[in-house]
């Protein structure tokens, strides 16, 4: 908490238990962030990693309360794999019940558009996978907003095409693979981010 994104390092991350107590690290915990993350991991023990933030385009699109339209291959990666959740819309989740009301609606979805709030992605495989799909979901929201702003009715992908694209570009392996280039760039350009950190192997 109180660490700018540009200053986040492996050395200043914290480890917290499911009661919100800091086990490792010297920073305080963000209560609202913890409540949501803890609820997801309690509800879905198989979830390896979850990403959540209030990004510009994601938060803007979440205000519409609508799922993504299948306007591109990027959006198709989330075909039948993302959900709009209206529970606790716009409210700061500081109570356990608020986190649970959101977590219980995630199901098997890779991405979540939390209405009036922001984006959330989950992975059953790795942090790499969850992180890439978070970036991809933000990009898909940006594309949707740009199309809407044009005032031109978009040509949507057919269900068959969207399903086909998701099967080929929406897997855990693709998420993991695409994040490797991002990780390598970070490791090379951010000298305080250790490239020797243990990496998750590719999904089988």
Residue ranges with predicted function:
Residues 1-204:
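Glycine-rich flexible loops
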């Amino acid at each position: 908490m109180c660490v700018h994104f540009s200053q986040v390092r492996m050395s200043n991350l914290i480890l917290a238990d499911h009661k919100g107590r800091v086990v490792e690290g010297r920073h305080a915990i963000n209560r609202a962030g913890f409540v949501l993350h803890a609820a997801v991991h309690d509800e879905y023990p198989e979830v390896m990693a979850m990403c959540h933030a209030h990004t510009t385009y994601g938060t803007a699109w979440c205000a519409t309360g609508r799922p993504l339209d299948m306007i591109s291959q990027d959006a198709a990666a989330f075909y039948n794999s993302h959900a709009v959740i209206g529970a606790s819309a716009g409210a700061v989740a500081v109570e356990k019940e608020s986190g649970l009301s959101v977590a219980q609606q995630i199901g098997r979805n890779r991405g979540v558009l939390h209405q009036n709030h922001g984006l959330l992605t989950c992975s059953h495989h790795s942090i790499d996978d969850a992180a890439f799909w978070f970036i991809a979901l933000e990009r898909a929201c940006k594309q949707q907003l740009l199309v809407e702003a044009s005032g031109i009715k978009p040509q949507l992908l057919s269900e068959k095409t969207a399903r086909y694209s998701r099967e080929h570009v929406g897997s855990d392996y693709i998420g993991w693979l695409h994040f490797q280039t991002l990780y390598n760039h970070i490791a090379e350009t951010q000298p305080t981010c250790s490239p020797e950190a243990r990496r998750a192997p590719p999904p089988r």
